Amino acid sequence: MVYSVGLTGNIASGKSTVAEFFSELGINVIYADKIAKELTSKDTPCYQDIILHFGSSVVLNNGELDRKHIRDIIFSNSNERLWLESLLHPVIRKKIEEQLIVCTSPYCLIEIPLLFNKHHYPYLQKVLLVIAPLESQLDRIVKRDHCTKKQALAILATQPNLEQRLEAADDVLINESGLSELKAKVNKLHQKYLREAKIKQ
């Protein structure tokens, strides 16, 4: 199977921008969140399980899941978050594996927001952690989710702590300057992963 790098980091750390930079370099990127969205689209088995568990309050008028409402529930209740993770994560892992088989680039990048146990993803050779200063994260969450700073802090509080993240990481990318510096750091890592992927072959 192709050499694989897991890309992770707390919410609003700049993961998606980093993933875009790798994509611009010709690297196939698999998005765990996108897979999760597809798995929970209308009338799928996971969609049915979620409605059975949470009730009709999580369904919009058009029949789609009210993702914002579900997000609010799981951010305020760790048991509900764990239930949802235990439902989705095994299926997401399987789908990632299927996509890796058809990967055409020298190595593959997999964006997995909640990656703090490498053993759950045995096909990963490396884990790249993106971290950003707290204030930057808060600003991004407030702008993106149109929420208050207090709500943004509550969202961040549900994320794995940095120590947990660092334990799983092989490489750490600090996103604290502008985009050009971030791009330069990605280019450097890209060269490193190309070398490592070549050695693996």
UniProtKB/Swiss-Prot annotation:
Pathway info: Cofactor biosynthesis; coenzyme A biosynthesis; CoA from (R)-pantothenate: step 5/5
Residue intervals passing through the bilayer: none
A Pfam family of this chain: CoaE
Keyword Amino-acid biosynthesis: no
Subcellular location: Cytoplasm
Domain spans labelled DPCK: 4-201
The protein's enzyme class: transferase
Alphabetically ordered keywords of this record: ATP-binding, Coenzyme A biosynthesis, Cytoplasm, Kinase, Nucleotide-binding, Transferase
GO MF, one annotated term: dephospho-CoA kinase activity
Purpose of the protein: Catalyzes the phosphorylation of the 3'-hydroxyl group of dephosphocoenzyme A to form coenzyme A.
Family per record: Belongs to the CoaE family.
Full protein name: Dephospho-CoA kinase
Organism name: Legionella pneumophila (strain Lens)
